[in-house]
A protein has these predicted regions:
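Juxtamembrane intracellular "pre-TM" segments in multi-pass secondary transporters
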Residues: 1-5, 185-222
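Transmembrane alpha-helix termini and helix-breaking/packing motifs in multi-pass membrane transporters
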Residues: 27-35, 87-90, 147-167, 244-246
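Loop-to-transmembrane helix entry
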Residues: 36-47, 246-261
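MFS-fold secondary transporters
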Residues: 85-90, 106, 178-179
Length: 262
């Protein structure tokens, strides 16, 4: 396996571990606030899901017209910086609002970085190695999804929220360094795409929407996925309170692991 492919896989694995740690630590902390936590958990998740709903369609259009590596580097650096700042907040009230604000900001960046990563893979990985790379990426993602909640439980239970935020910051910066060390020219930036404007991005989004509507099978799958996500949203809201519901500190981590395992 080429070095750049290894760096790309390592970057994705580290980033995913950080995301699980961040969400687990924040959710358990907010859920532990009692009745106040029930209300603010809704705000916390609404900020993420609402932003994702509106910005995900834009992410692909932006990734097509800008350098994907730069998007990934900027989002990782800002994510690491914000988590580091959060870790030094001493007031619980400020921390609560800070977690919601940073989660919203990370949702904005995720809308662009997720699409950019998938598109950047084509730049780094040769065409004849894409299938093998994607299979390795999927295996690593599944392993991380299953193991990270248990690791997050052990770490958060032992050290608390602030050290978890510091660890999240480290994962973002480590992902940044791995991506920064990759040197591959991005050839998708044509002369036309250099002259990017809001109008051109909106035109790309419109063309994508028309394509989805015309392709009935894709449209049907998206409708089904939306319906499934509606029920998953209810589960995601209740899951962080499972530690209190089942009176066991590892209940939430167990649910996340079982969900990842399918």
């Amino acid at each position: 396996m080429k070095k750049n492919e290894t760096k790309l896989l390592a970057s994705r694995a580290v980033n995913k571990i950080g995301n699980v740690m961040y969400d687990y630590g924040n959710s358990t902390w907010i859920a532990g606030l009692g009745s106040i936590g029930q209300k603010y958990m809704g705000y916390y998740q609404l900020a993420e899901n609402g932003i994702s709903l509106f910005l995900n369609p834009i992410g692909g259009a932006v990734a097509d017209r800008f350098k994907r590596r730069q998007i990934l580097l900027v989002t990782d650096f800002i994510g690491g910086l914000m988590c580091a700042v959060l870790a030094f907040i001493g007031n619980d009230n400020i921390m609560l609002y800070g977690l919601i604000a940073v989660n919203a900001a990370l949702a904005i960046m995720s809308a662009f970085s997720g699409t950019s990563f998938r598109s950047y893979v084509v730049t780094v990985v040769a065409e004849d190695r894409l299938v093998a790379f994607n299979s390795r990426l999927e295996v690593i993602s599944q392993i991380v999804s299953i193991s990270s909640p248990l690791f997050a439980f052990l770490f958060v239970d032992r050290f608390g929220l602030k050290p978890t935020l510091i660890l999240d910051s480290v994962t973002f910066f480590l992902s940044f360094l791995l991506l920064f060390s990759i040197r591959e020219e991005e050839k998708h930036i044509t002369t036309e795409k250099r002259n990017t404007s809001i109008k051109s991005i909106l035109r790309d989004i419109k063309e994508g929407m028309i394509f989805i509507v015309k392709e009935k099978e894709i449209f049907f799958l998206l409708v089904i996925a939306s319906m499934v996500n509606f029920f998953i949203a209810a589960f995601n809201y209740l899951a962080p309170f499972s530690n209190q519901l089942f009176v066991h500190p590892s209940s939430y981590a167990t649910l996340l692991t079982m969900g990842a395992a399918g």
